[in-house]
Amino acid sequence: MARRYDSADSKRRITSACVRLFIEKGYHGTKMTDILSAADVSSGTFQNIFHTKDGVLEELVHFMFAGQFGAAKNMIHISNEVGIDLQNDPVLLYAVETSIQLTLAELNENLREVYVEAYTQAKIAEMIYRKTAGELYKIFSPYLPGLTESDFYELEIGTAGIMRGYMSRPCDMYFPLKKKLGCFLSLALSAYKVPEEKQAQIQKYIASADMTAIANTVMQELFRALAMRFEFTLSN
């Protein structure tokens, strides 16, 4: 019993230390020596549980993606100016959620690293594809009625690649955030055959919304949720 307890406690301390360090120092900036010191475990203990820090990243990404659509829904505000039912429109929900992801990457370089690494690593990317495919099927099947959830999995590989590409390229004066969001949504919504009139309504809403303020609120809530889930306190 003691060995099982120690193993569970070591895993808890490792995940807590890793997630905190990923947020504070970035995924690539977090060295194995940092993790071992913060978690107070040996390299052998770490390797027995996770092998590499990629294993902890997978747990972190799973948690982050699990609540992303709920977070986006909470950020949608009612407006009569764009001509769509903002509270009950799944396409808008998708647009807000993906726009929040892209904006988070601009607000915090360490989150950018986490997202880009997640879309880059084959095992973690596969998890994202499979989790997202079901949501995409629910959202976009009215526009692509002949497709199965498996078909949406294949489309998600492409749109996730677009997401990764835009995330990895920081905004600047020549490619500001609003333009990045507009480009991504145009490509993604076209891939899912959303009618042009509907796309224009969605684009108008996103362009008029303060996505930086919305994403900043989501980021603070995310950090609080991560601190609670993985039992750590962020440095000031």
Question: Whereabouts are the PLM-identified features?
Answer:
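C-terminal peripheral helix-coil segments that are non-catalytic and often amphipathic
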Residues: 138, 142, 168, 172-236
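An amphipathic alpha-helix adjacent to DNA-recognition modules
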Residues: 11-16, 28-29, 49-73, 77
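The short coil/loop that forms the "turn" connecting the two helices of the helix-turn-helix
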Residues: 9-10, 41
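Hydrophobic alpha-helical connector segments
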Residues: 59, 73-111, 131
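Helix-turn-helix
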Residues: 21, 25-55, 59
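Pre-recognition alpha-helix immediately N-terminal to the DNA-recognition helix
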Residues: 13-21, 100
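Amphipathic alpha-helical packing segments from all-alpha helical-bundle domains
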Residues: 72, 96, 116-168, 179-186
